[in-house]
Design a protein with these regions (language model features):
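NAD(P)H-binding glycine-rich loop region in Rossmannoid oxidoreductase-like domains
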Residues: 1-37, 41, 47-53
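Conserved loop-to-helix N-cap of the C-terminal "lid" that shapes the substrate pocket in Rossmann-like
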Residues: 92, 132, 137-145, 162, ...
Length: 252
């Protein structure tokens, strides 16, 4: 393919470190593994599947329900197995929900809709599913970027490893709503509905309701131990930074 040919052409430049963000890591790895020294891919916490362990370590929980993520996860496992058998070693970094300046933050319907943020700012009701509450853990983009930098600068420790990125803790769905209530300075009522109603009428897209179904609390102890990772921003702080950015960009 043209993409593969373009990557092979780039590989001739003999870059020391190659980082893949667009989700094309397997093609990147094949193209660069004989010329680069270190290849790092960005995955997702969701690739581990529905979490049965919280905080969730860097191991398979169950098959990922998102086909694209499942395919990429299998490729990551292949690259981990192949790491060091050619010139390059391989590392994968798995962030949770990415937050902070530069991107509309996750909102209470599991998306990044500016219209939902306007509704939150106006104190409109939020609908959450009944039952035990999910843990939501947005992580600041700068903290995720820092883990990539730590992997680059600690190649031996990072070689052949999968690392979770994440905040120091997560918050419940109700607390997630309260964070926005505090930031916008309004009371945001919460109304609970059945899961049937929630998935049918509130968040019909699995990519949205999964945020309120599967815990998002990565275990970051491995990154702390091997790379010295220490996230700077809490969920409250990174959401506030993202909202400040929206105001600065006149999105709100």
């Amino acid at each position: 393919s043209k993409v593969a040919d373009d990557l092979k052409g780039l590989a001739k430049e003999r870059f020391d470190v190659v980082i893949d963000f667009p989700g094309t890591a397997y093609n990147t790895y094949i193209a660069f593994r004989d010329t680069a020294s270190h290849i790092i891919a960005c995955g997702s916490l969701w690739m581990f599947g529905y979490p049965h362990i919280v905080p969730t370590p860097e191991i398979r929980q169950e098959k990922c329900v998102f086909e694209g993520y499942e395919k990429r996860y299998q490729e990551i496992l292949e690259m981990i197995e192949d790491s060091g058998k050619h010139r390059a070693v391989f590392t994968a970094i798995m962030p949770p929900n990415i937050c902070g300046p530069g991107k509309i933050p996750l909102e209470t319907r599991g998306g990044r809709s500016i219209d939902v943020h306007h509704a939150l700012k106006e104190g409109k009701p939020v609908y959450l599913p009944e039952g035990p509450e999910v843990l939501i853990g947005p992580c600041d983009a700068s903290d995720i970027a820092n883990l990539f930098a730590l992997a680059v600068n600690n190649r031996i420790a990072a070689a052949g490893q999968i690392f979770n990125a994440g905040s120091a803790y997560s918050v419940t769905a109700s607390q997630f709503v309260k964070i926005y209530s505090d930031i916008y300075g309004v009371d945001i009522p919460i109304e609970k509905v059945s899961w049937e109603v929630y998935k049918k009428d509130i968040c019909p897209n699995i990519g949205q309701w999964w945020h309120f179904y599967a815990h998002m609390q990565p275990d970051i102890s491995k990154a702390r131990r091997l790379l010295g990772y220490s996230p700077r921003y809490t969920p409250e702080e990174t959401i506030a930074r993202a909202v400040d950015w929206m105001f600065a960009e006149k999105l709100l």
